[in-house]
From Swiss-Prot:
This is Ribosomal RNA large subunit methyltransferase E. Signal peptide: none annotated. Keywords: Cytoplasm, Methyltransferase, rRNA processing, S-adenosyl-L-methionine, Transferase. The gene is rlmE. Specifically methylates the uridine in position 2552 of 23S rRNA at the 2'-O position of the ribose in the fully assembled 50S ribosomal subunit. Its main location: cytoplasm. It is found in: Cytoplasm.
Length: 258
C-alpha cells in the first residue's frame, strides 16, 4: 500500500460522518449532508414525493426515506444499478435522467408530481479544473432542467455544484425558476471540497428556456433529431474533443466576463 493509500485509509478511519454512516447502516457519509440541508432549509417534509437524480449508491435515498416516512414516496434515477432498499416506497430506476423515456418511467411510478427534486451527483472527474467545472455546470443544469419538467409548482430543489468562476451564473439561473435561491455548504462536506449546494425554494412553474441568454445554458448540446440534451458528463468514455470543447466554452465565457 502506497503513502497516498495509507493516508486515505487513515482519513476515513478518522472521518466522523463516515464512521457514523457505517454504524447506522447508511450507504454514504453524504446521507448527513441531506439531513443537514433539510434541517436548515426545510426542503423535504413528511409524506412528500421526492425524486433523487444521480442517486447511487443510495445514501440520499435513505435520508429522504427517513424524512418522508412510510407515507411518502421516492424515485431515484442513476446510470448505475442501485441495490434495492427494503422499503416499498423507494424505487431506483437505471437510466439517463436526460432521456424522456426515463422521466416517463419515473412519472408513471409517482403517485403525483414531486414536491422535491434532489441531486448529489458528480460528473466524471478528469483532473483538469476547467473541464471539471464545465462538467459540473453541465450536469447541474440538466438537473435543473429536469426539475422544471417534473416539479409541482411551489416545489423545492437542491443540487451539488463545484465552485468556479461561473458558479454565480448558475445561482442566477436557478433564481429564474424559483422564488428564492440560496447557497450553502453543510457541515458534513469536507473542508477541502469545492462542492457547494444550491437551493431553489418554491418553483414558479416556468418551463426551462433553452434560448436563455445565460452562459450556463450554452454548455448544453441539443440533439436536433431527438430534441434531447446530450451529456458528455454522463459518459465514461468522454472524448478529448468533448473536453476541448468544454474548455473553449469556459474560456470564451470568462473573456466575456472580463
Amino acid at each position: 500500500m502506497g503513502k497516498k493509500d495509507k493516508r486515505w485509509v487513515l482519513q476515513r478511519k478518522n472521518d466522523h460522518y463516515y464512521n457514523l454512516a457505517k454504524k447506522r447502516n447508511y450507504r454514504s457519509r453524504a446521507t448527513y449532508k441531506l439531513f443537514q440541508l433539510n434541517e436548515k432549509f426545510n426542503l423535504i417534509k413528511e409524506r412528500n414525493v421526492v425524486v433523487d437524480l444521480g442517486c447511487a449508491p443510495g445514501g440520499w435515498l435513505q435520508a429522504a426515506r427517513d424524512i418522508v416516512g412510510d407515507k411518502g414516496f421516492i424515485v431515484g434515477i442513476d446510470l448505475q444499478t442501485v441495490k434495492p432498499l427494503p422499503y416499498e416506497n423507494v424505487i431506483a430506476i437505471k437510466g439517463d435522467m436526460t432521456k424522456e423515456e426515463i422521466l416517463k418511467q419515473a412519472r408513471d411510478l409517482l403517485p403525483e408530481k414531486p414536491d422535491v427534486i434532489i441531486c448529489d451527483a458528480s460528473p466524471n472527474i478528469s483532473g483538469v479544473w476547467d473541464v471539471d467545472h464545465a462538467r459540473s455546470l453541465e450536469l447541474t443544469t440538466m438537473a435543473l432542467m429536469t426539475a422544471t419538467k417534473m416539479l409541482k409548482k411551489g416545489g423545492n430543489f437542491v443540487v451539488k455544484v463545484f465552485q468556479g468562476d461561473l458558479f454565480e451564473k448558475y445561482v442566477q439561473l436557478v433564481s429564474e425558476y424559483f422564488d428564492k435561491a440560496f447557497t450553502t455548504k453543510p457541515r458534513a462536506s469536507r473542508d477541502e471540497s469545492a462542492e457547494v449546494y444550491v437551493i431553489g425554494k418554491r418553483f414558479n412553474g416556468r418551463k426551462f428556456d433553452m434560448n436563455s441568454k445565460s452562459p450556463i445554458v450554452k454548455l448544453l448540446d441539443t440533439n436536433p433529431k431527438e430534441n434531447e440534451i446530450t451529456s458528455p458528463s454522463l459518459r465514461k468514455d468522454i472524448s478529448k474533443e468533448d473536453s476541448g470543447l468544454m474548455i473553449k466554452r469556459i474560456k470564451e465565457m470568462r473573456s466575456k466576463k472580463e
